[in-house]
């Protein structure tokens, strides 16, 4: 299950594998592993991805222990193949458009409906909120500055916004060394019209991805793999006079939904014009228009730089027993962000109707020049694992086994100094054994023993066992008559215990 946010450029998708299993939505997100390491999936260049595997039953996710309760999504990036260098280039252009936007009453319809409602409530003609001259001006559009009639959704929201994706890859190699390299560019424009003359107050997002994957056969039995990938990105957002609990984009749309069509005229000759309630109605005080939440408040620009690096050294141990091999793996992830905030205030104007019927614009408040503020964020984490794998066939009997130790530590800098951080650690021991007879009858036993620093001492470790049995019915002789339209049929039953450590960190200390 996937859902997207409202109109914000590059707003992260929300993905559920096993539905919402917690009161906290963020605690229901699946675990994403990119090349076996927990990393962000949503900012990968799709041209780097070889395949995606979704694990959701208890037997498949129990080995991930306290991280597997919400399912696991395994992402494998592309690797080079032996042969001449292959270069490919792809480009795509897309138009984003709102699927459906609400339609609003115009000023005349609004005023007539409001007055009629008051008449039904027993108001007299002289008690009605909208003056007759205002209603007539709404109908005839004789003075659109003093008596505005604005469709704010049409005025502020574009019909389309451009999105582009460009990518170039090169891959190949010899029998001993193989490589895959990729460069990608992603751009996304915002869906809002920009009326600010001095700076851009729309949304925009640019991302530049890079990747280099190497496979080196050191000997006939020893292989070294190295993956390096990352991205550089910048995101431009309008400065918003927001409300607690709402994102920028939600605040902007709330302003559009709540604004009346007669609350302002938008930008007139470079001036931001609100309506004067004294010309229209005694029942409406502050005539805030749909632009007040973001227009003239400045903008934010966030620059990000992320590096992902991992290596794997694998050794076949056939001299001990056929099918046995061992590997060690290490990974390092680093991210840095810099947010520059330029905040200010643009003055607004109100119409002043003169005795001769002409309209002048009167400035109501003062201008605040754009200020400057910076915020820096840093993050890094380490991951190591060591494992023994065994896989062997004995006639129609196929067995495999895995024993693995893994550990990770994540740093979250806090406070004004980037050197202040509170680490979060994870440690685990994994065991798995599988057996199948003639690729027909299956048995899978798993165990994860994990510890997480998100819990209090004495409560940090847990055992997560699981097992499954399966029967591939399509391999049976009695299924041959239906093989033409049912070539694969499998029955599987599994049971297991999984955990979730995505609670708020260190709540046991409060």
Residue ranges and their predicted role:
Residues 414, 480-509:
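Solvent-exposed loop/turn elements at secondary-structure boundaries
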Residues 77, 89, 168-174, 212-216, ...:
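Residues on the lipid-exposed face of transmembrane beta-strands in outer-membrane beta-barrel proteins
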Residues 148-171, 260-269, 344-444, 452-456, ...:
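Outer-membrane beta-barrel transmembrane domain signature of Gram-negative proteins
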Residues 80-85, 175-176, 191, 221, ...:
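Short loop/turn motifs that connect adjacent beta-strands in outer-membrane beta-barrel proteins
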Residues 98-100, 144-184, 188-192, 201-287, ...:
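Flexible loop and strand-edge segments within Gram-negative outer membrane beta-barrel domains
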Residues 87-95, 183-185, 226-232, 328-334, ...:
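Transmembrane beta-barrel strands of outer-membrane/channel proteins
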């Amino acid at each position: 299950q996937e859902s997207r946010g409202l109109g914000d450029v590059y707003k992260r998708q929300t993905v559920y594998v096993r539905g919402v299993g917690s009161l906290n939505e963020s605690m229901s997100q699946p675990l994403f592993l990119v090349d076996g390491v927990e990393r962000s999936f949503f900012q990968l260049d799709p041209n780097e991805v070889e395949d995606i595997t979704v694990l959701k039953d208890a037997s498949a996710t129990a080995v991930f222990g306290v991280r597997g309760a919400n399912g696991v999504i395994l992402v494998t990036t592309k690797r080079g193949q032996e042969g001449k260098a292959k270069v490919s280039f792809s480009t795509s252009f897309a138009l984003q458009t709102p699927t459906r936007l609400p339609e609003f009453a115009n000023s005349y319809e609004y005023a007539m409906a409001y007055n009629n409602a008051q008449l039904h409530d027993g108001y007299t003609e002289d008690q009605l909120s909208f003056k007759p001259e205002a209603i007539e001006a709404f109908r005839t559009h004789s003075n659109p500055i003093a008596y505005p009639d604005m469709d704010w959704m049409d005025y502020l929201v574009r019909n389309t916004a451009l999105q582009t994706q460009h990518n170039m890859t090169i891959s190949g190699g010899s029998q001993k060394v193989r490589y895959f390299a990729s460069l990608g560019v992603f751009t996304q424009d915002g869906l809002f019209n920009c009326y600010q003359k001095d700076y851009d107050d729309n949304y925009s997002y640019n991302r530049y991805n890079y990747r280099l994957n190497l496979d080196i056969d050191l000997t006939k039995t020893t292989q070294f793999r190295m993956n390096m990938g990352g991205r550089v990105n910048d995101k431009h957002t309008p400065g918003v006079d927001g409300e607690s609990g709402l994102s920028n984009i939600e605040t902007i749309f709330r302003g559009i939904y709540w604004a009346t069509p007669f609350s302002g005229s938008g930008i007139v000759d470079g001036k931001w014009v609100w309506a004067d309630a004294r010309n229209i109605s005694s029942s409406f005080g502050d005539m805030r228009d749909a632009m007040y939440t973001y227009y003239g408040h400045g903008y934010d620009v966030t620059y990000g730089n992320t590096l992902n690096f991992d290596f794997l050294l694998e050794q076949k141990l056939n001299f001990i027993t056929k099918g046995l091999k061992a590997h060690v793996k290490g990974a390092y992830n680093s991210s840095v962000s810099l947010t520059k905030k330029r905040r200010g205030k643009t003055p607004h104007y109100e119409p002043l109707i003169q005795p001769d019927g002409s309209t002048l614009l009167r400035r109501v408040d003062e201008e605040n020049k754009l200020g400057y503020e910076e915020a820096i964020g840093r993050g890094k984490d380490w991951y190591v694992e060591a494992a023994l794998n065994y896989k062997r066939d004995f006639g129609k009997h196929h067995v495999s086994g895995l024993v693995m130790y893994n550990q990770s530590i994540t740093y979250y800098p806090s406070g004004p100094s980037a050197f202040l951080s509170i680490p979060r650690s994870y440690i685990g021991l994994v065991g798995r054994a599988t057996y199948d007879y003639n690729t027909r009858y299956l048995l899978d036993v798993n165990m994860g023993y994990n510890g997480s620093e998100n819990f209090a001492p004495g409560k940090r470790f847990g055992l997560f066992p699981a097992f499954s049995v399966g029967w591939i019915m399509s391999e049976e002789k009695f299924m041959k008559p239906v093989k033409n339209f049912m070539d694969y049929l499998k029955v599987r039953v599994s049971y297991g215990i999984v955990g979730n450590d995505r609670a708020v960190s260190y709540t046991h200390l409060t």
